[in-house]
């Protein structure tokens, strides 16, 4: 380690501290302090101020209601969509539905196999008799 790095850091930090000390922040004032004294307002100015405040309040509430309605519309469209399921039961049901909807197309090309309740057991009994 050289002495150049700590000395440059020290010089930089002293410069920052000097600049920070010379800066002064302005005090924040609330919006109520900037308003003139309500007793000093004329009746016409008071009505105009009240009308402006009511208009701003109504506009803000209208925007909030519109946003809520948009969110509800997005939420209802999501619930209306069909959820996909990849479990064995769901896949089996989908395949059964596909076969039942296809109707005669699959049945006309279907070659029956010799499986069922009589396929294995009856032959053994018939052979023994």
Swiss-Prot record:
A single GO cellular-component term on record? extracellular space
> Does the UniProt entry include the keyword Disulfide bond?
yes
According to the UniProt entry, which residues carry Phenylalanine amide?
120
Which positions, given as ranges, span the membrane? none
Matches recorded under SMART domains: CALCITONIN
> Which positions make up the signal peptide?
1-25
Q: Name one GO biological process term.
A: adenylate cyclase-activating G protein-coupled receptor signaling pathway
Which UniProt keywords are listed?
Amidation, Cleavage on pair of basic residues, Disulfide bond, Hormone, Secreted, Signal
Disulphide-bonded residues? 85-90
Q: State a single Pfam family of this protein.
A: Calc_CGRP_IAPP
Location relative to the cell: Secreted
What GO molecular function annotation could you give as one example from this UniProt entry? hormone activity
Residues excised as propeptide: 26-81, 126-129
> What function is annotated for this protein?
CALCB/CGRP2 is a peptide hormone that induces vasodilation mediated by the CALCRL-RAMP1 receptor complex. Dilates a variety of vessels including the coronary, cerebral and systemic vasculature. Its abundance in the CNS also points toward a neurotransmitter or neuromodulator role.
Q: Which family does it belong to?
A: Belongs to the calcitonin family.
Q: What is this protein called?
A: Calcitonin gene-related peptide 2
Question: In which organism is this protein found?
Answer: Equus caballus (Horse)
């Amino acid at each position: 380690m050289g002495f150049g790095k700590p000395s440059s850091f020290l010089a930089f930090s002293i410069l920052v501290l000097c600049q920070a000390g010379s800066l002064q922040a302005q005090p924040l004032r609330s919006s109520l302090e900037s308003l003139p004294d309500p007793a000093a307002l004329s009746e016409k100015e008071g009505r105009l101020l009240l009308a402006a405040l009511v208009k701003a309040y109504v506009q803000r509430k209208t925007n909030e209601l519109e946003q809520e309605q948009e969110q509800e519309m997005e939420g209802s469209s999501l619930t209306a969509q069909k959820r996909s399921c990849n479990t064995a039961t769901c896949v089996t049901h989908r395949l059964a539905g596909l076969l039942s909807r296809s109707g005669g197309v699959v049945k006309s090309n279907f070659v029956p196999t010799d499986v069922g309740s009589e396929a294995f057991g009856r032959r053994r009994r018939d052979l023994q008799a």
